[in-house]
Structures are given as C-alpha cells and as structure tokens.
C-alpha cells in the first residue's frame, strides 16, 4: 500500500495511511442467495481489458438497495480465504486425505497405494489415473491439424502423489525394472514460455547434455511435463513424491509413455491448484513430450484427457476442440492385438518418426510456395482446398523425393527453419514428400468422415477405411483393393508399419467377423487394432492365438477393449 497515494472504493477515496490503519479488511468472502446474485450479475458490465464480469461489482448494486450486511470475524484464523496461488495451494492441502484412507476407499488401487505408504509413509496424497488409448481413425495427422477418433482403454498409469515443500519430484515404481529417479522442477529457465522458446530450450546444449546423461530413463517423460507446465504457467510448482503403477503394455502403440506425461500433468495440477482449459492442458502435454526427442502432436494426450466411457470421441486440433461422441453399439467390439514387437522412441526410432514429420513440413512449404493463391494455414487445409483432381495435381507438383541439399536450393529463404527441422533427426538421405503428403491428406479426410460413418452404423465402410489407412503405413504384404474414387480411398506411403504387423493385419482381414484392422499408434512396432462383429469376437481371438501367437511362439497378447473414461483425480 505504501506505493499508492489513494485508493478509491465505492466513489470514496482513502489515503494509503487510512488503509494501513483500518481495523477492517475485506476478505473477499461473499455469501449470496442464488436469485439475488443472478440479478446483480445481470447489471454488471464487462467493459475492461479482460472483458470479464467482476464479482466485486455486485457489492455496489446491493449497497444501493440497502442489502449488504458485514460480518465481523474476531479471530482471523477462522477465515478460509486466500489472495495468491501459493495461499490457495496451502489451503488445499488441508483437504487432502491420508494414503491409508485412500486405501480403504479405493481398493482397486491397493497395490500402488500400499507401495506408496511403504516408501513414503502414510501421508496426505492424491491418486491420478491416466488411461491408455486407441485411435480408430486419424493416425499421424493431429500435429498437421487433422482430427482423431479415439477411446481410452482400461489399462492405465496410476500415480499416488504427495506434495513436497520444495520443487523436487521423486519417482518410485511398483515395478522394480524402473529405478527410482529424482529431479528439480526449477532447473528449467523461467523465461521459456512460448512454443518457440520451448523448442529453443530443447535444442540447447544444456538440454542435450541432460538427455544424453539420462537417455532411456522413464523419468524423462515426467521431467518433460513438469518443465513445460512450470515454464508455460510462470508459477513455481511444488514438488511431489510419487509412486507409479502401470498396466499399459510398453512400446505397444497404446501410449504408455504419453500416459506418464498426462498423469504428471494431472498430479501437478491437483497439488498446485492449477486452473486450465482442456486445450491448454492438451497442448502443454504434447509439447512436454517433445523433451524426450520426438516431435509428435497431442492426440494421445487429448484422448486420455477427454475420452468418455462407452464412446468413440472425435477430437479436432489447431485449434483443439472436442467434437461428437459416438456410442459403440453392442453389435461391434474393438480388439487390440500386441505384435510383441516393441518400438522405443528413445532408441533410434524417433529419428524415423521425426523424419516423417519433417517430410510433412517440407511438402507443405513447397506447396504453399507453388500455390500462393490458396489459403493454406495448416497442412490440413490442403485436403479441403479443391477437388480430388486439383489436390492430386498440387501434390504432384512437388518433388516426389528430395534430399536436404536439394531442399536448401529450392527454399533459400527458409534456411534457418530447414536447419531447425534437420536438427530433430538424423539425415535419412531423402524424404518421401509425395507418399507422406498423400497419406496425410487422405487420412485427414478419412478421420473427418469417421463420426458420420460410425453414427450411421456403416461399420463395413468404416472397416474398409481402416484397411486403406493401414496400407498407408504398410511396408509389406497385400494392399486392400481400391473400391472408389476420392481422397479417402488413397493410402499414400507413410511406411511406419513392420512386416510382422502387416502379416498380422493380413491374417485378421481374412478372418470372418473382422471388419477392418490397422496399425495402432505411431508404428515401427506395437499393436494392431481391429473392428469386429461382436458375435464373432471369440472366434477371432481363437484364430489370433492359434495362427499368430502360437505359431510364432509369442505370448497370447490380444484383448477386447472396453472404452473407459479419460484421466481422473481421486482425492
């Protein structure tokens, strides 16, 4: 108050000395009846920089009508109020419950809660559940502005997290294969707030050295989320002691790694009283996972955050929004079959993933330069900027394949951006621009059409789209017969499958009751996803076990998915 000469309240001015000497303080705790509050708010304007309605403006309305009463509190400690985020965080801890109480109330999580108590003691904590996910249509495109059609599965990553007084995050895992880890959230510089600044931080020598020292550590996914949330929100987050349990198969295309990111974000949000929109949450999670070296989108994180039990949810990106949810009818089942071929982003495959993303970028840069009359803001816009023939012509106008040196010659005005993209992956020799771009625009159309097909119960057509979609990732085997004209019937060549996964899809597509099958997840290993007639699900699983798993001497790893709710916090 010393820096203020006067303060104006309800048309009266008070000097700083008067304010400092007053025995009365407005604690900003107001009690209304609902009808009166609604009426008062309707009289308040929003003519301010934020365009907001202020609750305090209602006081003047009630005062004019003689309807204000003041309650004097003799003991300030009896007030439950706060003025800052730090005070709110401190208050919220009083409402947390001990782990032993959580153990009694949530017996389904008894294993991880008991492990938490054993490692950290019977402390006040929260439980966070972040499920795995499957994407029925819309692979490799959400970072280009495409949409996804997703559902969460029952397998999940579960955190039991207790707040700390410092900014240290300590991690322990029920599975002894994952060693304990610890780091300080405050290591990342505070001035990193925008996406561009975050990318610059990730490409810094300091970050590269940190990653090289901890390459392959499961804790890097937690670290990436914590760093990104702390920097973007410009708030000193409290640390936490965490016990983790995961039931999502690792490196199987069901997003076990992204579930660590989402669980971290949910736990930090709960313990720090963060208030974010779904869009903010999803975008920061997607960017947080870039810390491990990948440059994918936020589709997996969005699926985990926004899924709805019993439904397939349509999600849009750039900007993010939640679209239509379609209930899965009892006539259909979704089966996931693990190929038992792992794809680990930290062990080299990230170069291949990032090279595909780079091919999208390069194709888009060249198409925009070639067709300046088109309004193209995101890669997605190519798919809807003309007729089928026009779009094919646009794609054919750029080099089918191109090297880095050729790109630098063709785009001399973009050398800085090109070098920035080159730095995300090893040089593949040449980039398949046409195959990648054709897959992208066709998958964008398929994903956009998916809710209508599902809502109209056109499952045979949807299954055909799944087969074509997989052909865009296929590296071997027999592509599906092309049965129509239009972008949705094109497959392109993203080529992130494997011979084993292709063989599994071919086996399933020849099985009675299977409507369609495709690669699940980013690829280079992982699972196959199938849409199946429900009354044939048992026979499909039988053939899977006998003709795939048993024949290859692999553990039987297929299951029927039950669509579950998205991420949750249990207090």
Locations of regions flagged by a protein language model:
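Conserved core of the sugar-phosphate nucleotidyltransferase
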Residues: 1-49, 56, 63-67, 73
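A short glycine-threonine-serine/GTX helix/turn-capping micro-motif
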Residues: 16-31, 45, 79, 324-325, ...
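Fold-level recognition of mixed alpha/beta catalytic cores in primary-metabolism enzymes, strongest
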Residues: 252-340
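C-terminal nucleotide
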Residues: 97-133, 137, 158-216, 311-518, ...
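Phosphate-handling active-site elements
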Residues: 232-239, 268-284, 534-547, 551-552
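Glycine/serine-rich anion-binding loops at beta->alpha junctions
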Residues: 134, 138-142, 245-263, 513-531
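Glycine- and acidic-rich phosphate- and metal-coordinating loops
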Residues: 201-208, 226-227, 234-248
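Beta-strand segments within the central parallel beta-sheet cores of soluble alpha/beta enzyme folds
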Residues: 172, 239-246, 276-288, 463-468, ...
